[in-house]
From Swiss-Prot:
Pfam families attached to this UniProt entry: Ribosomal_S13
Known partners and oligomeric status: Part of the 30S ribosomal subunit. Forms a loose heterodimer with protein S19. Forms two bridges to the 50S subunit in the 70S ribosome.
Top-rank taxon, per record: Bacteria
Entry keyword annotation includes 4Fe-4S: no
Protein's UniProt name: Small ribosomal subunit protein uS13
Ranges where the record places region Disordered: 90-119
Protein keywords: Ribonucleoprotein, Ribosomal protein, RNA-binding, rRNA-binding, tRNA-binding
GO terms for cellular component: cytosol; small ribosomal subunit
Biased composition, class Basic residues, residue ranges: 91-119
GO molecular function: rRNA binding; structural constituent of ribosome; tRNA binding
Family statement drawn from the similarity comment of this UniProt entry: Belongs to the universal ribosomal protein uS13 family.
Biological process per Gene Ontology, one example term: translation
UniProt cross-references to InterPro entries, sorted A to Z: Rbsml_uS13_C, Ribosomal_uS13, Ribosomal_uS13-like_H2TH, Ribosomal_uS13_bac-type, Ribosomal_uS13_CS
Length: 119
């Protein structure tokens, strides 16, 4: 029995709180909030939930922007900033850190592999 919520197969062997976190956009606090609203014990394993309880979880998860919709929203926000030419948009375009971190000696992950200086 595979439990599908928001188009994602959630792991049935795990507790409801942990299993919900397999959905993009749901972290620990939101998973606890969803369990509370659906009146489900977060420590209950997904395989032990009834179909009615799974439907309650689906309803609660449906109230949030998750998975594809959330990914699309985030990419559109970044694209909008780039089109407007904001500081953040420029940093995104150049592939540099956005939030004031130093780049002279760090930021290797964001900048990528070192490029040799051509003379």
């Amino acid at each position: 029995m595979a439990a599908r919520i928001a188009g994602v197969n959630i792991p049935v062997q795990k507790h409801a709180r942990i299993a919900l976190q397999a959905i993009y956009g749901i972290g620990n606090s939101r998973a606890l909030e969803i369990c509370k609203e659906a009146k489900i014990d977060p420590a209950t394993k997904v395989k032990d939930l009834s179909e009615a309880e799974l439907d309650a979880l689906r309803t609660e998860v449906g109230k949030f922007s998750v998975e594809g919709d959330l990914r699309r929203e985030r990419s559109m926000d970044i694209k909008r900033k780039m089109d407007l030419g904001t500081y953040e948009g420029i940093r995104h375009r150049r592939g540099l850190p956005l939030r004031g971190q130093r780049t002279r000696s760090n930021a290797r992950t964001r900048k990528g592999k070192r490029k040799p200086i051509r003379s």
